[in-house]
Amino acid sequence: SQIIAANGGSENAFTGHDYTAYFQQWEKSRLPLSFEIESNRMRNLLLSEDEFIKEIEVVKEERRMRTDDNPDAWLYEQFGFEAWQTSPYGQPIIGWRKDLDSMAVADLADWYKRYYAPNNATVVVVGDVMPDEVFALAEQWFGGLAPSEIEVNNPPPEPRFESGREKTVERAARVPSFIRGYYAPVISADNPEDWEPYALEVLAYVLDG
């Protein structure tokens, strides 16, 4: 962060169910520095016990504020867990509290070593740059990094049900809340001409007002 700020840039990161993204925004002459930073992040991260202990408490507090003390967020989390019974999509991005309590720095190091690898990453560069320059930088900074053996997650199919599922949860809240969800077609590279996912996306906005 200090290096990026000293060079007039800004940076941030975010995590979703499918990937974690790190990004920088700065003047194009700093592009080589961006590749250097991300190359170091990919394979040279230092994970100390002291830093882990401090940061895991920050994550626990974030979970408490955003989910545990927020009835609506907590309900959505329970809904996802009920809807996806075999898929990782049923797990909260921030993690369950019990997992955060039992996590050790060794768990973090194992995850980092396994998944932070050039054969498990996508590099996106947008702006006034030349493709040849970008490919050369990618080769320079990532080409020499050793790949990892990536564990492919193939969860079993979701169990079929005929009459639906329902679950009632109790939480301190001013008003009751209700969520209903439906399994629906998804956008797939195997069937790019399928229009139904897009129609259902529009329908959801219409029904939501």
Language-model regions: role of each:
Residues S1-R30, M65-N120, G144-D190, D208-G209:
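Non-catalytic beta-strand/loop surface segments
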Residues Q25-I56, D194, V206-G209:
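M16/insulysin-pitrilysin zinc metalloprotease superfamily fold
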